[in-house]
Amino acid sequence: MSKGIKMHNSVMRLTIPNKKIINYAPHIVTSIILFFICQQLAQLTWKIILPVNFTDNALSSADMTSPAAPSAETALPRFTLFGLAEKTSASAPGGNLDQAPVSALRLRVTGLLASTDPSRAIAIMMKGNQQVSLGIGDNTPGGEAKIIAISPDRLIVNYRGRNEAIPLFNDPPAVGKNSAAPPARHLAQELRAQPQNILHYLNISPVMVNDKLSGYRLNPGKDPALFRQSGLRENDLAIALNGLDLRDKEQARQVLAQLPELTEITLTVERDGQKNDIYLALRDE
């Protein structure tokens, strides 16, 4: 390739199911990248610049809520996404919402953005074949229940006077043939339960320039094989996903809304001063 070319495309395809886990490398690494970037976007959305240290399990509720020295600036809401063992917003009506039973309503939650400011919390739910963004006080698709609280891993609704919980990714159990989940899904479940395990596969750190997010630095973790199989290289700087700028709050929210439906992914990274598109086709044929 000549030095004058500014773009480079790396193509990886996932087509053969039930092979060794390395065949799922693009899917797995992409799942990790999306999971962690969403975590970071949630924390950095409102320009709260907090150092991330996964070795100290920075995603635990203790770290996220530990007292800080008073600031001269007005306190901004903190956001979390997926898996934080954070208490449900105290401003929500009702009793102990953590004890709300799982709802039998056939509703699917595909994304949650929890906030210490309830008015800024967002739930993404399926409505037919489309996804809608809802907040506390809104009715669920179909109007059967009303949203009263949004937690990092569940939605609390009031249905016929009773508080019920709708878990994130509330998929009905698969029936029929062998329905074992692919490694990428197992990995996503593992990371939601133990986010610190990301370090085994990938190190991602936000890069700030003049107090502005300029991208996410990607490096291999303790298990570098999956990182290299995906087409990534050390010190790649992720800046966009499917043409949406990961550094922009509104575009990042669009990425979050699209995550459950993505089948093809183009991750744009800066490498040695040039932009590179890494194409990942996530197909089971």
Swiss-Prot record:
**Residues in the Cytoplasmic compartment per record:** 1-27
TM ranges are 28-46
- Indicate the principal place this protein occupies in or around the cell: membrane
User: Gene3D superfamilies, alphabetically?
Assistant: 2.30.30.830, 2.30.42.10
Give me any GO biological process, just one: protein secretion by the type II secretion system
Keyword annotations of the record:
Cell inner membrane, Cell membrane, Membrane, Protein transport, Transmembrane, Transmembrane helix, Transport
The record's function comment reads: Involved in a type II secretion system (T2SS, formerly general secretion pathway, GSP) for the export of proteins. Required for the translocation of pullulanase.
UniProt protein name: Type II secretion system protein C
Q: Which organism is it from?
A: Klebsiella pneumoniae
Q: Which gene encodes it?
A: pulC
